[in-house]
Amino acid sequence: MSTTRIAAHRGAAGGNIHCNTWVAFEAALAQGADIIELDVSRSADGELFVFHPGMEPAHLGIDTPLSRMEARGIRNLRYLNEDNTPTQLGISTLDEVFEQLKGRCQINLDKFPTCMADIARAVRRHGMTQQVLVKTEAREELFRQVEELAPDLPYMVFARREDTVSEMLRKRFPNYRGTEAIFPDETCGVAQPEYTERMHRLGLQVWVNAIVFDCRRMLAAGHNDDISVAGQPDQGWGWLMDLGADIIQTDWPGMLRAYMNRRETEGRKP
């Protein structure tokens, strides 16, 4: 059985079901996702919502950032669907999503550094410290913030091209889990099988991204969702699995799960 886990990028969206909504999270779990990745925004009066900062014009049709709105106004907003038509789906609070997903899957809380203390308090309030995963860039000032505000949360760092910090961080943070490896081409240090093998020897994990949010920015040297769903999954998801990735983030969790199952049935490298 494949040991690679599937992280659903903002859930599984499509049609009238918008990303980062409770329905998208249910759809992702039904399609076989192991991890739900979601984004966190904070209102002007301090409430945490599940929404990608900066996407207000595209997803809601408004120009005002949620960070400048009060919570009661945010609750009245509705997502737009793929045809730019309002849906019935509002913006969930982080508290609501925590209760929805508690005990069901791991949750990657993206945008963690933007409101680190508030997010960490919410995680503890729901008793979910070992169910979440948080990440930061690999910078000393952020390491110090995590030490102060969230030392009890499972933690990863972004490794862009190379990883120069994991051996230090595993000694510094008891809850250090590994890296989100980002590599625009196959020559990068984190794009080598030797890197994932070394991480595994250290008891650490490597997260990679098959998602494409900008075709001009390669997150995994072109081994992505686009080529996978277009008929070349061996060059996309399969390449990442052969790299030894522990977690693949995708916008197509159902298709990736089906591909993993097919590989296993065919007796290929898990």
Predicted regions and their residues:
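Phosphate-group recognition and catalysis centered on beta-loop-alpha active-site segments
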Residues: 1-270
